[in-house]
Amino acid sequence: LRNFRKKNQKTVFLQHGIIKDNLSHGIDASVAGMDMFVTSASREQQAVIERHGYTSESCILTGLCRFDNLPLEHSVKSKQILIMPTFRHWIMAANGTYATKEEKEKFVSDEFCQMYNKLLSSKRLKETLEKYDYILVFYPHYCVQPFLECFQDAKRTERVILASNKDYDVQRLLIESDMLITDFSSIFFDFAYMKKPEAFFQFDEEKYRGGHYEE
């Protein structure tokens, strides 16, 4: 980032979520050299100071505004389970919002797509949702949204919804859902903040940690 600054320009690092992975290659003071680093939790602030070389004066604790509207009590049961996996950099659409035929073919052949199609179309899942009268909403990371149509197997049951970011609001889904299933996404902090149950589906942890983000 140093190469993109104007002379004497001050830079502030704002986050979209709490840091949980090793991002030293991009945020270390020796690399990015931010004048101010905004953190969301006291333990995160401590980690940024101790691990990434920022001073207590330059690393400030403000909280995270995306938590402000999250209720601390979940009194109404919605009978809804939310699945929100994060993206994999090796199967992203170059365009960002539209996937080409070739990119979709690569995506469909990847373990990520195959495992979620298998899960979403599971007979056991369908029977369980019907037994307990639950709806399952599948809302993948926005980088996966261009491939939403690749999860066609999920359409075998009306109890599974493929949620597009054009039609569904992330925070509303988080608030309304009774349970979250994710993988390596920091979205689990939002659900933990609301003290609601979570489960982790990490079938490709070794590949993810080896070629995406280190823990």
Listing of model-derived features with the role each one plays in the protein:
Residues 1-71:
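Active-site and donor-binding regions of nucleotide-sugar-utilizing enzymes
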